[in-house]
């Protein structure tokens, strides 16, 4: 961790002035979710880009007093750099709508839909967007056998960054009765699909490109693989037939429009090996901005520097009436 990251962690509010007279940006990050660390790492690059662009930047570590802090500093715009609960689930956008402060990223309903795997799935299926078979299992069900034929995926309903995601393969010594539901009373059990991991970056409704994830160490694209060098190889642009590449772009833009997203979004797909069928895994309305994050990498391929990416995100800041 560098000195700048340590500085952000040690101070709940850090004021960084660029001195050029541009708008005042409140950079809200950290927070109380399991994705706090990822959010803080993202905020380092974002804050540097904002300062480079000439903005006055105030860093706020999200807490229960967020409304008071925002009233005190009175920013022109909030850059929502949170991941997970309270920032990515629509809570912070709801507060900012009430306070009439323009903010980056998606609004209340879009954020809430994307964050909740049950409701996003229902919405996508109603709009003919293909997803893997799944069921919801509750702790109170007291299931003592595999709830689905192996291999299957265990997903918390409301977590990002693959936190809490497990893949149960045929050979695994795993007994479902021992699963302790660490991230809530309900989980999604989803059919595991073997195939190409494909990621699409979108900005303001336009798909920028497709990237393929090639796993080098772990069996699936988990938290460790996402945030550590040497665990995966990124191939950008993804090596796909032109018609399939175009289909991914079109499908991603359809998903973006379906839940009325705003700003940057990352859509995750799997291309099944045997059937060449495309499945949507999820949509992320708060994609990471870390050095290993996918949206900045695809944006760079599309000719958009990290600083320009942040500027475009700021340009779309608004609140909902």
From Swiss-Prot:
Cell wall formation. It is found in: Cytoplasm. This is D-alanine--D-alanine ligase. ATP binds at residues 148-199. Mg(2+) 2 binds at residues 282, 284. It holds the Pfam family Dala_Dala_lig_N. One of its GO terms (cellular component) is cytoplasm. The lineage of its organism: Bacteria, Pseudomonadati, Pseudomonadota, Alphaproteobacteria, Rickettsiales. Mg(2+) 1 binds at residues 268, 282. GO terms for biological process: cell wall organization; peptidoglycan biosynthetic process; regulation of cell shape. Its cofactor is Mg(2+); Mn(2+). Keywords: ATP-binding, Cell shape, Cell wall biogenesis/degradation, Cytoplasm, Ligase, Magnesium, Manganese, Metal-binding, Nucleotide-binding, Peptidoglycan synthesis. It is an enzyme of class 6 (ligase). Pathway: Cell wall biogenesis; peptidoglycan biosynthesis. Belongs to the D-alanine--D-alanine ligase family.
């Amino acid at each position: 961790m560098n000195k700048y990251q340590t500085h952000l962690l040690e101070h709940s509010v850090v004021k960084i002035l660029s001195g050029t007279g541009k708008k005042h940006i409140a950079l809200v990050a950290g927070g109380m979710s399991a994705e706090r660390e990822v959010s803080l790492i993202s905020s380092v690059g974002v804050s540097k880009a904002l300062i480079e662009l000439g903005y006055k930047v105030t860093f706020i570590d999200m807490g229960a007093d967020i409304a008071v802090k925002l009233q005190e500093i009175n920013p022109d715009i909030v850059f929502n750099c949170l991941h997970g609960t309270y920032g990515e689930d629509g809570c912070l956008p709801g507060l900012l709508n009430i306070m009439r402060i323009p903010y980056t990223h998606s609004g209340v309903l879009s954020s809430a839909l994307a964050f909740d795997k049950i409701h996003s799935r229902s919405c996508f299926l109603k709009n003919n967007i293909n997803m893997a078979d799944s069921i919801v299992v509750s702790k109170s069900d007291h299931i003592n056998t595999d709830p689905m034929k192996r291999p299957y995926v265990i997903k918390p309903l409301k977590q990002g960054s693959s936190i809490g995601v497990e893949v149960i393969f045929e050979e695994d010594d795993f007994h479902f009765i021992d699963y302790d539901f660490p991230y809530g009373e309900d989980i999604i059990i989803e059919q595991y699909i073997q195939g190409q991991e494909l990621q699409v970056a979108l900005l303001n409704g336009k798909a920028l490109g497709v990237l393929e994830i090639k796993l080098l160490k772990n069996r699936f694209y988990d938290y460790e693989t996402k945030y550590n060098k040497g665990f995966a190889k990124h191939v950008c642009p993804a090596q796909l037939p032109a018609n399939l590449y175009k289909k991914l772009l079109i499908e991603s833009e359809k998903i973006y429009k379906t839940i009325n997203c705003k700003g940057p979004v990352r859509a995750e797909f799997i291309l099944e090996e045997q059937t060449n069928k495309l499945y949507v895994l999820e949509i992320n309305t708060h994609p990471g901005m870390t050095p290993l994050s996918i949206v900045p990498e695809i944006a760079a391929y599309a000719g958009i520097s990290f600083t320009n990416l942040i500027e475009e995100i700021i340009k779309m800041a608004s609140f909902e009436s």
